[in-house]
């Protein structure tokens, strides 16, 4: 009828069929999971291709032109993006700055790869505590083996320590000498992992006269135990290279033990130990990763040979390198020489006084006086070592800003000395009840000038003593 609206019928398809109609009509095709992955892969490939075409307008372009094939083999796409982003954000004023910065970020990315392979479950909070720049002295209370296991691989630049002597002190009790060395080997194995490659461990230990308890517990089982020799063997088993042994001459013997004044006859007399070993070990983990030439910054290098056990060296194969020999040979270098030769400037010079003092391998300086006139132990430690040892270690084997660790910290002498020379000093100590009061008193006294002039907080504490398998209670105390 005229004026009436014609009724229309709407047919609604089920949702699945509606999609099917759309696909068949070509209006909206939904890609499969496999197709979506291919699309994403193409986008990433396109992004990486554009990344390779990026121009910096400086010497980075020359380095990347030669080094790109090697970079593709070494890094993932994500790592390459990180590398390019770092280069893009850096404003270099010279070719030398380009070479140095490229080498720096390249080495950092390679180290990050190694750390993820060897310490994927490191303790993020603990590592952040160590990396916090608000304090130069880090006090960590806990079992050193457990603490070391939570650190990133190759994150420490120097280690200096004196271990708890086998049953020579009231706080160090083992069933026998074998148990002692089993514990020490566990700790030193973790130290090897945590110490940076081509770096140094300075280890102070003295030989003792005691019973190893392997045959008898009787007093007649006592003998001279050459701990220094045993530790050298242990370090080498773990992977360290033994370099040197300084003999610390402690001067006149103060003790009256074993004097046998009432029996001045043959076979009753023997000398008292008045020396200790200061053992020097290098870590040379063989690393065949290709490293850039320190002269031109390029990765076009040839595998040369091992210049030392565990130390890989390279020869630059870039014909346009700035330095070539008369026979047209490229620069020969290693990761170790890249570290050492980059720091040959006036501010890194070691004083003539220190060089002369440690020129001979027998060094004389007195032990720490820990008992005052009232017979009280003013340091709270039965075997503190003098500042001379960490001082020579810090100045000979680190640069300003680097990290120094003492896994058996005691009175934290190493950490204090490291901070005096503008290094980050870290100490790990198990006996908080025994040492803390005296340690804090010493730190407040020793670090007062540091606080006044540098703006750093005196020290920071991190407590891992309450760690258990099911629950970890961590207490962070920052004292300012």
Protein language model regions, located:
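Core catalytic lobe of class I
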Residues: 2-118, 124-437, 475-480
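PRPP-dependent phosphoribosyltransferase catalytic core
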Residues: 436-480
């Amino acid at each position: 009828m005229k004026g009436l609206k014609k009724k229309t019928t709407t047919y609604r398809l089920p949702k699945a069929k509606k999609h099917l109609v759309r696909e068949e009509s070509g209006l909206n095709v939904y890609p499969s999971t496999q197709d979506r992955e291919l699309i994403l892969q193409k986008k990433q490939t396109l992004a990486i291709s554009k990344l390779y075409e990026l121009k910096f307008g400086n010497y980075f372009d020359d380095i990347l032109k030669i080094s790109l094939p090697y970079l593709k083999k070494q890094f993932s796409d994500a790592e390459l993006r990180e590398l390019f982003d770092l280069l893009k954000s850096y404003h270099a004023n010279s070719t030398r700055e380009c070479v140095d910065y490229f080498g720096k970020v390249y080495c950092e990315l390679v180290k990050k790869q190694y750390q993820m392979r060897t310490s994927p479950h490191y303790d993020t909070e603990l590592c952040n505590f160590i990396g916090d720049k608000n304090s130069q002295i880090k006090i960590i209370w806990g079992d050193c083996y457990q603490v070391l296991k939570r650190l990133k691989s190759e994150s420490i630049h120097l280690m200096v320590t004196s271990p708890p002597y086998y049953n020579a002190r009231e706080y160090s009790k083992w069933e026998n000498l074998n148990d002692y060395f089993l514990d020490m080997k566990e700790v030193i194995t973790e130290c090897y992992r945590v110490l940076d490659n081509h770096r140094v461990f300075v280890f102070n230990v003295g030989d003792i006269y005691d019973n190893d308890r392997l045959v008898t517990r009787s007093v007649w089982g006592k003998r001279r135990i050459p701990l220094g020799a045993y530790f050298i063997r242990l370090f080498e088993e773990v992977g360290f290279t033994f370099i040197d042994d300084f003999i610390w001459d402690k001067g006149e013997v103060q003790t009256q033990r074993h004097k046998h004044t009432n029996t001045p006859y043959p076979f009753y007399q023997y000398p008292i130990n008045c020396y200790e070993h200061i053992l020097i070990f290098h870590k040379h983990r063989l690393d065949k990763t290709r490293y850039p030439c320190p002269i031109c910054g390029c990765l076009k290098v040839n595998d040369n040979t091992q210049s030392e056990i565990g130390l890989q060296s390279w020869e630059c194969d870039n014909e346009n390198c700035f330095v070539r020999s008369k026979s047209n040979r490229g620069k020969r270098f290693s990761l170790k020489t890249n570290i050492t030769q980059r720091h040959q400037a006036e501010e890194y010079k070691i004083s003539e006084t220190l060089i002369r003092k440690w020129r001979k391998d027998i060094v004389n300086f007195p032990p720490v006086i820990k008992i005052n006139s009232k017979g009280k132990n003013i340091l709270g430690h039965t075997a503190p070592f003098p500042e001379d040892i960490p001082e020579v270690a810090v100045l000979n084997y680190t640069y300003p800003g680097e990290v120094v660790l003492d896994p058996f910290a005691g009175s934290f002498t190493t950490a204090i000395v490291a901070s005096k020379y503008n290094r980050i000093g870290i100490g790990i100590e198990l006996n908080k009840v025994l040492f803390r009061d005296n340690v804090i008193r010493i730190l407040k006294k020793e670090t007062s000038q540091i606080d006044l002039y540098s703006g750093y907080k005196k020290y920071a504490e991190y407590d891992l003593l309450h760690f258990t398998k099911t629950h970890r209670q961590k207490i962070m105390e920052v004292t300012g």
